[in-house]
């Protein structure tokens, strides 16, 4: 169970903005943002599909998700691609519906 009182919660956006590395801690809980909503997970690695499902973007095939790296350009995440939430500079994620001709 994940609680806000957990001392091992790492807010990835704040670490990225502060230019700090997230400690690799087996008990870590990652706090991250997709669009304007904040989520918690104990999983360090999530696929693009999992991120879209967490954000309620169903079916995931109808949406795109981009990873925002602090100080860099957005990078598209594929549905099967795994993202490391502890990767240096990962700030947040943004989604957008795909045009029916995209995919």
Predicted regions located by residue number:
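Ubiquitin-like/PB1-type beta-grasp interaction modules and other compact soluble beta-rich domains
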Residues: 1-103
């Amino acid at each position: 169970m994940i609680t806000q009182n957990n001392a091992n919660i790492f807010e990835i956006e704040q670490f990225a903005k502060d230019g700090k590395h997230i400690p690799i801690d087996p008990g870590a809980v990652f706090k991250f943002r997709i669009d304007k909503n904040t989520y918690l997970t104990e999983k360090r690695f999530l696929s693009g599909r999992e991120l879209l499902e967490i954000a309620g973007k169903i079916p995931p095939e109808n949406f795109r998700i981009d990873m925002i790296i602090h100080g860099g350009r957005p990078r598209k995440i594929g549905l099967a691609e795994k993202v490391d939430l502890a990767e240096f500079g990962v700030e947040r994620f943004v989604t957008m519906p795909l045009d029916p001709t995209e995919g």
